[in-house]
From Swiss-Prot:
GO terms classed as biological process: photosynthesis; respiratory electron transport chain
Keyword terms, alphabetized: Chloroplast, Electron transport, Heme, Iron, Membrane, Metal-binding, Photosynthesis, Plastid, Thylakoid, Transmembrane, Transmembrane helix, Transport
CC cofactor: heme b; heme c
This protein's name: Cytochrome b6
Any one GO cellular component localisation term in the record: chloroplast thylakoid membrane
Other noteworthy facts: Heme 1 (or BH or b566) is high-potential and absorbs at about 566 nm, and heme 2 (or BL or b562) is low-potential and absorbs at about 562 nm.
Topological relation to the membrane, as annotated: Multi-pass membrane protein
UniProt subunit comment: The 4 large subunits of the cytochrome b6-f complex are cytochrome b6, subunit IV (17 kDa polypeptide, PetD), cytochrome f and the Rieske protein, while the 4 small subunits are PetG, PetL, PetM and PetN. The complex functions as a dimer.
Function, as annotated: Component of the cytochrome b6-f complex, which mediates electron transfer between photosystem II (PSII) and photosystem I (PSI), cyclic electron flow around PSI, and state transitions.
Keyword Glycoprotein among record annotations: no
């Protein structure tokens, strides 16, 4: 094992990276409220794992979506547990994200030189809310259907471009298969990819600039 480690150490300088991570100074004022961002990240990772597991059984069609969710809950091995963890972790992620935003705002974490960190964090907050909207529609039950119909109908109040925007969101004039396909693609591919990109921007900036001062 030592030879394998030495081979990687010679090429990647693993020890230097580990020393940098473990020797980072943590200010004395840091408390549990400064962990809210990390908890949000943990919830996101749980979402990715449980969501990926459910893609093996979920069918994104208007005729099969609800039945496939029922199958996950009643027939698939540990399906009820995986979906329940996914659901509760989603709620926890939103709650932790909101509390994290409040903590950063109250401690002045958005001020110079951390403006870009704040901007990327706000984008991540919007993406988190988008996860909720798109995921809500996937079971294709009554609550999900009407929630999507209302949310996608909001832009219709915008003059001139309102109706085209609604049709762009839904994929057609009404909520149907095109809407479900769009939301499924957004929820399982587009939003996770964008979230990963902005996290890769967000965390290095925190690492570089350090934690903001006390309240």
């Amino acid at each position: 094992m030592s030879k394998v480690y030495d081979w990687f150490e010679e090429r990647l300088e693993i020890q230097a990276i580990a020393d940098d991570i473990t020797s980072k100074y943590v200010p004395p004022h840091v408390n549990i409220f400064y962990c809210l961002g990390g908890i949000t990240l943990t919830c996101f990772l749980v979402q990715v794992a449980t969501g990926f597991a459910m893609t093996f059984y979920y069918r994104p069609t208007v005729t099969d979506a609800f039945a496939s969710v029922q199958y996950i809950m009643t027939e698939a091995n540990f399906g009820w547990l995986i979906r329940s963890v996914h659901r509760w972790s989603a709620s926890m992620m939103v709650l932790m994200m909101i509390l994290h935003v409040f903590r950063v705002y109250l401690t002045g974490g958005f001020k110079k030189p951390r403006e870009l960190t704040w901007v990327t964090g706000v984008v991540l907050g919007v993406l988190t809310a988008s996860f909720g909207v798109t995921g809500y529609s996937l079971p294709r039950d009554q609550i999900g259907y009407w929630a999507v119909k209302i949310v996608t109908g909001v832009p219709e109040a915008i003059p001139v471009i309102g109706s085209p925007l609604v049709e762009l969101l839904r994929g057609s004039a009404s909520v149907g298969q095109s809407t479900l396909t769009r939301f499924y693609s957004l929820h399982t591919f587009v939003l996770p990819l964008l979230t990963a990109v902005f996290m890769l921007m967000h965390f290095p900036m925190i690492r570089k600039q350090g934690i903001s001062g006390p309240l």
